[in-house]
């Protein structure tokens, strides 16, 4: 979640453990006189993946809420994985606002005054249940460039990225903090563990290690903070005794963790 004032929060993606996250962070709790609700003013979805959307069900008693997403994501969430359809029965449901995939189309979610959001089209894949699986169109996955209007500082959030296009590289160059896809250490990781027959890139994720990986990409840019996010439990960087973890530390790349706070 991001905030410009520490009082109103915009939730970026809604993971399955959202209730636990809210219970652990008093910043999201409502004022004492509010019988039902949170300090979440709006939601921004970057894709229609299960791990980024099922937390919407947790928010059902606090609806209506504005949700910002691309039209492609909204289509998935009303057809292939119809959370929007289900939730419309709670107090008017989610009020969908379309995100234009044009990088120059800035927007400000409700409650985020003082911050400017820009969509960054990411080359990734749609969820397995989507009609766009392996038939990728702009809007299946986006990153977010978030700029503080007062300081001009920039945060770039890119949770699912198979390869970096020119816009991604441009935004990285302009950023003070980059939160980037760290799902898998190696492209063959899920195959090697016997969990899938697909490469990381088949699923839409750039491996962290190796030529063309996230480490090599991040090292191209002089960014104050580089943080890997969206880390799968098969990823060896989670073992702090591993050479992979120490390699990251030596290169100034951080691992995200639950409850991590970043001020930009």
Descriptions of predicted regions:
Residues 1-44, 48, 54-60, 164-171:
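Pre-active-site segment of Zn-dependent metallo-hydrolases
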Residues 38, 48, 92, 113-115, ...:
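Structured loop/turn residues at beta-strand edges in well-structured enzyme cores
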Residues 139-141, 149-154, 162-259:
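Cap/insert and terminal regions of metallo-dependent hydrolase folds
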Residues 1-15, 71-142, 146-157, 253-258:
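Metallo-beta-lactamase
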Residues 21-23, 54-56, 78-79, 129, ...:
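Short glycine-/acidic-enriched loop or helix-start segments at secondary-structure transitions
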Residues 11-15, 39-51, 69-70, 156-161, ...:
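Active-site neighborhood of phospho(di)ester-bond hydrolases with catalytic His/Asp-centered motifs
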Residues 4-5, 26-36, 85-89, 148-150, ...:
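Alpha-helix termini
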């Amino acid at each position: 979640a991001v905030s410009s004032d520490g009082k109103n929060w915009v939730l970026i993606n809604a993971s399955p453990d959202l209730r636990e996250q809210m219970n652990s962070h008093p910043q999201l709790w409502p004022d004492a006189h509010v019988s039902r609700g949170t300090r979440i003013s709006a939601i921004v979805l970057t894709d229609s993946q299960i791990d980024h959307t099922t937390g919407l069900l947790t928010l059902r008693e606090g609806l209506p809420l504005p949700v910002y997403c691309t039209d492609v994501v909204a289509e998935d969430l009303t057809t292939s994985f119809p959370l929007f359809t289900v939730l419309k029965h709670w107090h008017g449901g989610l009020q969908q606002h379309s995100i234009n995939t044009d990088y120059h189309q800035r927007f400000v979610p409700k409650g985020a005054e003082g911050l400017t959001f820009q969509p960054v089209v990411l080359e990734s894949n749609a969820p397995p249940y989507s009609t766009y699986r392996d038939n990728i169109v702009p809007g299946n996955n986006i990153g977010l460039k978030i700029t503080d209007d007062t300081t001009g500082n920039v945060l770039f959030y890119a949770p699912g990225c198979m390869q970096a296009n020119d816009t991604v590289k441009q935004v990285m160059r302009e950023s003070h903090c980059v939160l980037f896809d760290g799902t898998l250490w190696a492209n063959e990781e899920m195959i090697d563990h016997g969990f899938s027959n697909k490469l990381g890139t088949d699923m839409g994720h750039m491996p962290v290690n190796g030529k063309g990986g996230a480490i090599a990409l991040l090292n191209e840019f002089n960014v104050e903070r580089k943080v890997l996010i969206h880390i799968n439990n098969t990823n060896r960087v989670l073992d702090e005794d591993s050479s992979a973890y120490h390699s990251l530390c030596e290169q100034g790349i951080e691992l995200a963790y639950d409850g991590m706070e970043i001020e930009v």
